[in-house]
Amino acid sequence: MLTDRQLLILQVIIDDFIRSGQPVGSRALSKKHEISLSSATIRNEMADLEELGYIEKTHASSGRVPSEKGYRYYVDHLLSPQRLTQEDIQKIKSIFAERIYDLEKVVQKSAQILSDLTNYTSIALGPAVKDNKLKRIQIIPLNKQTAVAIIVTDTGHVKNHVITVPASVDPSDLEKMVNILNERLIGVPLIDLKDKIYKEVADVLRMHIHNYDSMLKTIADTLDIPQEEKMFFAGKTNMLNQPEFSDIQKVRSLMKMIEQEKDFYRLLRKHNRKGIQVTIGRENQLSGMENCSLITATYSIGKEQLGTIAILGPTRMEYSRVITILNRVASDLSTVLTKWYQNN
């Protein structure tokens, strides 16, 4: 159990190191107005904090820097929310200024604004398409041989696919087919569509449409949408501006980790609990992230959790600011998406 004096010194050390990136010494601490202690007393307390594993000495300086344990304690017990500026709030609102009605585009724009506001790397994991349900199918003829099939889900995901229309299929039959598909498939999870077409809808099509079989496979393939979530990055190179990554080996390790999108995808999938989650350094259990922290939040439509947004930064991250911004974006994103899609 840390004493009040140790808590104060630990908080000031971490705040100062986050701000400056420079190791913090007892002399510098003694000049802080929050700390009315002598350099000798501060040195003794710092020695205890070091022995307890909350701070550590660097080779190049007599000052101390926070350890992973120190950052963890700081995030769990010492942080207070940071007030957002009006400029911050306006930038967040700009995500939703256009009524895009395309969930992927809104999520992608959220990632960009998060990166702009924090100067770190942001990642957004889109909704798992397999969890979406079909809202509407349209087939619009382009000419006698081709048409565009438009698939719209209940969460605004839109897929356009150019298809070949066999010469044996009459335009009026195409319209009938679309009506039957919408009657039978609206509200069906995308993961079940292909199976349902062959097992249930095919018999209805056979009764009403000549040469239905020539279009059946084309439509079924069109509805076979990839089911993994899409992952969007913004500000991939922002981390290179951090002094921690001036070392070329650390840069290589970091960039390799970011480029390994499958590993990063699996990492984000683990961060699917509601609320803000912070993992620091080696807690991330991913090579290349030893000097990084990851802060994540989930977003939803109503009570249905859809995806994850995250900020990747150095362990010397502005935790208070980033958590406040991420929490606001996740909350606003959930509110707006619920308003747009839940009742449609």
From Swiss-Prot:
<dbReference type="InterPro" id="IPR029016">
    <property type="entry name" value="GAF-like_dom_sf"/>
</dbReference>
<dbReference type="InterPro" id="IPR036388">
    <property type="entry name" value="WH-like_DNA-bd_sf"/>
</dbReference>
<keyword id="KW-0678">Repressor</keyword>
<protein>
    <recommendedName>
        <fullName>Heat-inducible transcription repressor HrcA</fullName>
    </recommendedName>
</protein>
<dbReference type="GO" id="GO:0003677">
    <property type="term" value="F:DNA binding"/>
</dbReference>
<keyword id="KW-0346">Stress response</keyword>
<comment type="function">
    <text>Negative regulator of class I heat shock genes (grpE-dnaK-dnaJ and groELS operons). Prevents heat-shock induction of these operons.</text>
</comment>
<dbReference type="GO" id="GO:0045892">
    <property type="term" value="P:negative regulation of DNA-templated transcription"/>
</dbReference>
<dbReference type="InterPro" id="IPR021153">
    <property type="entry name" value="HrcA_C"/>
</dbReference>
<dbReference type="Pfam" id="PF01628">
    <property type="entry name" value="HrcA"/>
</dbReference>
<comment type="similarity">
    <text>Belongs to the HrcA family.</text>
</comment>
<keyword id="KW-0805">Transcription regulation</keyword>
<dbReference type="InterPro" id="IPR023120">
    <property type="entry name" value="WHTH_transcript_rep_HrcA_IDD"/>
</dbReference>
<keyword id="KW-0804">Transcription</keyword>
<dbReference type="InterPro" id="IPR036390">
    <property type="entry name" value="WH_DNA-bd_sf"/>
</dbReference>
<dbReference type="InterPro" id="IPR002571">
    <property type="entry name" value="HrcA"/>
</dbReference>
